[in-house]
Amino acid sequence: MVACVIKDWQGSEVGETALELRVAKAENAAHIVHRALRRQMANARQGTASTKTRAEVRGGGRKPWRQKGTGRARAGSNRSPLWRGGGVIFGPKPRDYSIKMNYKERRLALRTALISRSDSLIVVEDFSDKLPRPKTKELAAAIARWGVQPNDKVLLIVADKQDTIYLSARNIATVKLIQATSLNVFDLLNADWIVATVEALGKIQEVYGG
């Protein structure tokens, strides 16, 4: 169980909450989180890179010059990989980079990654009422009041999509906004700080607590 201090819009401590998630054993934690991270990054690859071999490049059917008597090196095609405009040797072809991982393992890795970042977790009260209309400057100021340095990367987790928060956060280069149901290992590990609303923490407990 991880105890968390709750901060309000002004950055003052107003209460406490707890996050209780089942995590991997200490000896297996790094391995399972690493596997989940590799899977996520591999599955994000399009795998559409493609090159043409000498057999696929247009042209090159006629022998450029006779085999002997010219003094030049022998050549059978002007689409040889040695020639400019020729085919590519061992170039990439479309392939599937995806890595499979069991559902229960993925969930365990996600919970483990989140708990491992508990020292960087900031829990705040719901602030949607503080932003009746999109205001990037006000959100940036609030994030600073919560203890985040200007150039630190922030993962902002909310319970549900709210347009005013989304529009306020999208122009802050160091802030990434996601919903509690869209948690992923890469974002959790990549951020310097994880800021979650109390409602988002409850949603995380509800969705991933099993």
Swiss-Prot record:
One of its GO terms (molecular function) is structural constituent of ribosome. Residues 41-79 are annotated as: Disordered. This is Large ribosomal subunit protein uL4. Disulfide bonds: none annotated. Belongs to the universal ribosomal protein uL4 family. Residues 43-52 have a biased composition (Polar residues). The gene is rplD. Part of the 50S ribosomal subunit. Residues 60-71 have a biased composition (Basic residues).
